[in-house]
Amino acid sequence: MSGTDENDFEATYAVEMHCESCTNDIQKCLKDVNGIKNVTFDIKDNLMNVEGHAAPSAIINALKNCGRDGIIRGTGKPNSAAVSILGQYTTGPFENTVKGLVRIVEVAQKKTFFDINLNGVEKPGLYYASVRASGDLSEGVKSTGDPIYKFDQPIDCTSPSDSIPNSFSGSSFVSAPVHVWELIGRSFVVTTDPEHNVNKDNDISFGGVIARSAGIWENDKEVCACSGKTLWQERKDAIQHNIRF
């Protein structure tokens, strides 16, 4: 294992495995993912721990390409992780549908990674992300206030979606000099407008409230107390709602 640096964090994933042969196969699946420094397995509990600075979505995609599925169970230290489910608040065939997910993890003082994944957007092109002052979505993204942080790197959404016909997908793994605690309760917004203006009727925008998520080893439930469904049953439901990571 290489030495750690300030960009590294740990993440745990639920991955079905039965023996050492399974773990060897998973290692092969992940060998081309940039940023992985160490991988360990708990076969009994079907858990994989990854250390490094690889985007969690890149790890999930690598497993998918090998015919396996993975569920993120926790990232980073306690109180250092967050998530935002991005919905579209417009009229038409794409009304109020999930368009993506952002996983957020703080790795160092004033350094936080954002793993942004979009899927099912109807217009191909570049999309621009920002953190907004408010988490008020009563009027969709128009009521989220001014940006408190704008990401310079756009998200290229020109790849055809592999799950939603006639739509496109894209991803970006970026960092910002912010703390996770500063973001909780605010909103994450993505728009086609390069000036991050969400009030133009001819632009496409979507967003979601930023909420805390589990840190590493903080989420060990196997059955949801609310629905009674297993972890993998919940996973299938999430995918049906376009929540893939």
From Swiss-Prot:
Cu cation 2 binds at C224, C226. InterPro entries: HMA_dom, HMA_dom_sf, SOD-like_Cu/Zn_dom_sf, SOD_Cu/Zn_/chaperone. Disulfide bonds join C29-C66. Its main location: cytoplasm. It is found in: Cytoplasm. It comes from the Eukaryota. The keyword Disulfide bond applies. Belongs to the CCS1 family. PANTHER family: SUPEROXIDE DISMUTASE CU-ZN -RELATED. This is Superoxide dismutase 1 copper chaperone.
